């Protein structure tokens, strides 16, 4: 899977960082040391790390991913990364 989306809440710049959904590459999620969780009331799971986005972005860069775009949506920051 060449694309990855990660996000965090602006008020939570120091983490946690959401790094994937229930359909994400499990090998990549293991490399990021992400835990799969389901928040009460949601009918989907997501992978999360207890690190700031900067640390996660650095890990993904070492794995060959590059930031394609970044945006703020309300109180959420989102990065899109791609691996050639």
UniProtKB/Swiss-Prot annotation:
Gene3D superfamilies: GTP cyclohydrolase I feedback regulatory protein GFRP. It comes from Xenopus tropicalis (Western clawed frog). Mediates tetrahydrobiopterin inhibition of GTP cyclohydrolase 1. One of its GO terms (biological process) is negative regulation of biosynthetic process. This is GTP cyclohydrolase 1 feedback regulatory protein. Keywords: Cytoplasm, Membrane, Nucleus. Belongs to the GFRP family. InterPro entries: GFRP_sf (IPR036717), GTP_CycHdrlase_I_reg (IPR009112). It is found in: Nucleus; Nucleus membrane; Cytoplasm, Cytosol. It comes from the Eukaryota. Homopentamer. Forms a complex with GCH1 where a GCH1 homodecamer is sandwiched by two GFRP homopentamers. One of its GO terms (cellular component) is nuclear membrane.
């Amino acid at each position: 899977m060449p694309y990855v989306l990660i996000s965090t809440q602006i008020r939570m710049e120091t983490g946690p960082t959401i790094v994937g959904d229930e359909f994400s590459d499990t090998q990549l999620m293991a490399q990021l040391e992400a835990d799969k969780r389901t928040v009460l009331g949601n009918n989907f799971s997501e992978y999360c790390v207890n690190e700031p986005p900067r640390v996660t972005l650095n890990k993904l860069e070492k794995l060959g991913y590059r930031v394609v775009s970044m945006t703020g949506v309300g109180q959420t920051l989102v990065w899109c990364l791609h691996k050639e």
